[in-house]
A protein has these predicted regions:
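Second-shell loop/turn segments in exported
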Residues: 16-17, 34-36, 75-76
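Active-site nucleophilic cysteine motif
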Residues: 22-32, 80-90
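Deubiquitinase catalytic domains
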Residues: 84-136
Length: 136
């Protein structure tokens, strides 16, 4: 399945999947690879993301089931998985759409910056595997 997915994206879109470490920070690693060509910048991406969410509490808190301050504190910790809330924040803070490919040549999900006029920037493209891992 994984090899077929990689071949499909290469053949139909010209994309190559770059594998990132599966250590709980894979989403942030994949974004760091897309933004900085360095997955080791994942800690900086995480920090910027959580700072942005904290500054925009009123916007993000309704999408978080637990106490928002506790959520942000927990998500700041290395190894905590990122999710759709963090992807939306990253899209907004970098003013770039984020396309998520999951075993298809077309994105399964796309996150857009809040100000749609800013989504002219090149998308961040991530692949999602086995319901728990992101690659670049």
């Amino acid at each position: 399945l994984e090899a077929d997915f990689a071949r499909l994206l290469k053949r139909t879109r010209g994309f190559e999947i770059k594998v990132v470490r599966g250590d709980g920070a894979c989403m942030f690693r994949a974004v760091a690879d897309q933004l900085y060509a360095d997955q080791d910048m994942h800690g900086e991406v995480r920090r910027l993301c959580m700072d942005y969410m904290e500054r925009n509490r009123d916007h993000f808190a309704p999408f978080v089931a637990e106490n928002f301050s506790s959520y942000v504190a927990r998500k700041r910790q290395p190894g905590q998985h990122g999710n759709h809330v963090e992807l939306q924040a990253i899209s907004e803070m970098f003013a770039r759409p984020i396309e998520i490919y999951e075993y298809s040549e077309n994105p399964r999900n796309v996150f857009y910056p809040t100000i749609r006029s800013l989504d002219v920037n090149v998308p961040i493209r991530l692949s999602y595997h086995g319901s728990s891992h992101y690659n670049s």
